[in-house]
A protein has these predicted regions:
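Short alpha-helical "packing" element that flanks the helix-turn-helix/winged-helix DNA-binding module
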Residues: 4-11
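Short helix-capping/hinge SLiMs at alpha-helix to coil transitions
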Residues: 12-17
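A short acidic, leucine-rich amphipathic alpha-helix
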Residues: 20-28, 264
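C-terminal leucine-rich, beta-strand-based interaction scaffolds used for sensing/assembly
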Residues: 31-148, 152-155, 163-176
Length: 280
């Protein structure tokens, strides 16, 4: 359907570094507008996902326009050139409300908000399905008639993955890990553009795991840039204090990242009464 194509190509276009085929399939499975366009209502069941064939067919039809780019051994789908990217922006990302909603959904995906079996509500419009001459789905646990309602709401598992900052093979060896570079690349970008300031503050900037990982992979200055960006979005005084503190301890923690926790506690604990959000 048209909405499937517009959303799919919109997500590829707005992603900071492109998307993998699996990521696109996951994200489209979270998008109720897409599901309402491609899922036959009598097929609604757990888990609720779009067919992999739809994404594969779309890629096949756009061969030469969508190309593969290897980034840290991950294969990402991107437009073949900047001209195509600009055209796609005009075609698929012209509606501000849709763009805001799509950035928010991408942020939820990279936050892992719907992973681990957490179910997301799916609302479908019976009138839309009636116009397609399709009888609407009845939940087996709710046998009462829904004929008088214009829409029904049920929750379904979309089977999207957990999104930790790092993947550890052995919990007994915490220094051996693989960084979730996709989350590192995309999350802050989509949180800022969707205006999800609480998630930006407490899910990222005030998250010790994020800061520690950034330092471990040599991205201390990038972490400071992200904190400054978050401050410009929120004007929260705690963020300004955190950035100042990190600049003061930069030499120490770069020399010994394991000292980060002690250094932060030493400087932040005395001021949590006046800066309460630092407790996070």
């Amino acid at each position: 359907g048209q909405r499937f194509v517009f959303r799919a190509l919109g997500y590829v276009t707005m992603a900071k570094a492109g998307l993998t085929e699996v990521e696109l399939e996951d994200i489209l499975s979270l998008d109720n507008i897409v599901l309402g366009d491609v899922i036959v209502p009598t097929y609604l069941k757990n888990p609720l996902r779009i067919s992999h064939d739809l994404v594969a067919k779309l890629r096949e039809e756009l061969e030469g326009y969508l190309v593969e780019r290897q980034v840290r051994n991950i294969t990402l789908m991107v437009w073949a050139n900047r001209h195509l990217h600009l055209i796609a922006q005009k075609l698929y990302l012209s509606n501000e409300e849709d763009v805001h909603q799509m950035h928010s959904l991408l942020a939820e995906y990279f936050l892992g908000a719907w992973s681990g079996g957490r179910k997301k509500i799916f609302t479908y419009d019976n009138n839309h399905f009636t116009s397609l001459n399709i009888s609407h789905h009845k939940n087996p646990h709710h046998q009462q008639s829904h004929e008088k309602t214009s829409s029904d709401k049920y929750s379904y598992d979309r089977q999207t993955p957990e999104q930790p900052w790092v993947f550890q093979c052995n919990l007994l060896e915490p220094d051996i890990f693989f960084v979730n570079h996709r989350k590192m690349t995309e999350l802050v970008y989509h949180l800022t553009r969707s205006g999800r300031t609480d998630d930006l503050m407490f899910g990222v900037i005030m998250n010790f795991s994020w800061l520690y990982t950034m330092i471990k992979i040599g991205q201390f200055d990038k972490a400071l840039t992200d904190i400054d960006l978050a401050y410009s979005c929120t004007q929260e005084k705690e963020l300004k204090f955190l950035a100042t503190t990190l600049r003061c301890i930069k030499v120490k923690v770069l020399k010994n990242p394991a000292s980060l926790s002690a250094e932060l506690q030493q400087r932040l604990l005395p001021v949590v009464t006046s800066l309460p959000k630092l407790r996070h």
